[in-house]
Amino acid sequence: MQTSLLKPKIIAVESLGENHARVVMEPFERGYGHTLGNALRRVLLSSMVGYAPTEVTIAGVVHEYSTLDGVQEDVVNLLLNLKGVVFKLHNRDEVTVTLRKEGEGVVTAGDIELAHDCEVINPNHVIAHLSKGGKLDVQIKIEKGRGYVPGNVRRYGEDTAKIIGRIVLDASFSPVRRVSYAVESARVEQRTDLDKLVMNIETSGVITPEEAIRQSARILVDQLSVFAALEGTETAAEAPSRAPQIDPILLRPVDDLELTVRSANCLKAENIYYIGDLIQRTENELLKTPNLGRKSLNEIKEVLASRGLTLGMKLENWPPAGLDK
């Protein structure tokens, strides 16, 4: 009886348009089409690295609910249009570019003044419409990232000091626009219970659909490699046992509790030198201590309570090795 699993031998890529392709893989063992298809789809949508505008500063604008004279779009729509520009950076993680346009006409992504290592994938994308006398002066910060990052997360980050007029954008870095998959029946010789995986992938143009699926597969392999390495690690039974960590406050001398001299001397007479020694004693045990009355006991309880401790607590492995008496 054959025990080895089938691996796909037929991989076909069919172009469905610009940046849109259908990838067909077969044969898979029954169930593996859904297992791998769903995993690849989730990685493609959430874990691919891309580029997006993250901050915008518009001359004459203080906040996103403003309007600009001579610009048909309000600032909210202007920002939405800017988020639709697809950027690609080469050998750097962030860059700031400028968009300046005056006079009547249409403003497109092709009007953005780019650095030599920055590229616009969709230069015909419309950003705004200017009327006679209209003017637009915009600074756009582009960053490399992964997935989707809401603007409020970045706005309150440690390196995002408030700058008047700067607008922080929600950033969708993923270069993958849409992914769907279907599992169909496949046949190999006499076997008809196999799966065929069909994936439809559409990207923004930063990467091709074929490269997107290659990258997602590499991400999955890298994540699963941790499980493959389990055979070379110590088992729980073989791992050396470690003593539980002891709260440092328990290792401090009772003198640190700043008790009255009478109470402190009574404790030391009973060989109670550390706070860890003290909390393991009960009230009845302490009341049997010579010269330690109810008043001293209440003092001890109050001081311990102020540190989140009580009498009668149980400690394992006490006293720890090397603790001087």
From Swiss-Prot:
Function: DNA-dependent RNA polymerase catalyzes the transcription of DNA into RNA using the four ribonucleoside triphosphates as substrates.
Annotated protein name in UniProt: DNA-directed RNA polymerase subunit alpha
Alpha C-terminal domain (alpha-CTD), as annotated region: 246-325
EC number assigned by the record: 2.7.7.6
Domain of life: Bacteria
Record remark on domains: The N-terminal domain is essential for RNAP assembly and basal transcription, whereas the C-terminal domain is involved in interaction with transcriptional regulators and with upstream promoter elements.
Catalytic activity: RNA(n) + a ribonucleoside 5'-triphosphate = RNA(n+1) + diphosphate
One GO BP: DNA-templated transcription
Region (Alpha N-terminal domain (alpha-NTD)): 1-231
Disulfide bridge positions per record: none
Protein's gene: rpoA
SUPFAM superfamilies membership: C-terminal domain of RNA polymerase alpha subunit, Insert subdomain of RNA polymerase alpha subunit, RBP11-like subunits of RNA polymerase
Keywords assigned by UniProt, alphabetized: DNA-directed RNA polymerase, Nucleotidyltransferase, Transcription, Transferase
GO MF annotation list: DNA binding; DNA-directed RNA polymerase activity; protein dimerization activity
InterPro entries the record matches: DNA-dir_RNA_pol_insert, DNA-dir_RNA_pol_RpoA/D/Rpb3, DNA-dir_RpoA, RBP11-like, RNAP_asu_C, RNApol_insert_sf
Family membership noted in the UniProt record: Belongs to the RNA polymerase alpha chain family.
HAMAP family: RNApol_bact_RpoA
One Pfam family hit: RNA_pol_A_bac
Entry-linked Gene3D superfamilies: 5' to 3' exonuclease, C-terminal subdomain, DNA-directed RNA polymerase, insert domain, RNA polymerase, RBP11-like subunit
Gene Ontology cellular-component annotations: cytoplasm; DNA-directed RNA polymerase complex
Protein's organism: Burkholderia cenocepacia (strain HI2424)
Lineage of the organism: Bacteria, Pseudomonadati, Pseudomonadota, Betaproteobacteria, Burkholderiales
Subunit relationships: Homodimer. The RNAP catalytic core consists of 2 alpha, 1 beta, 1 beta' and 1 omega subunit. When a sigma factor is associated with the core the holoenzyme is formed, which can initiate transcription.
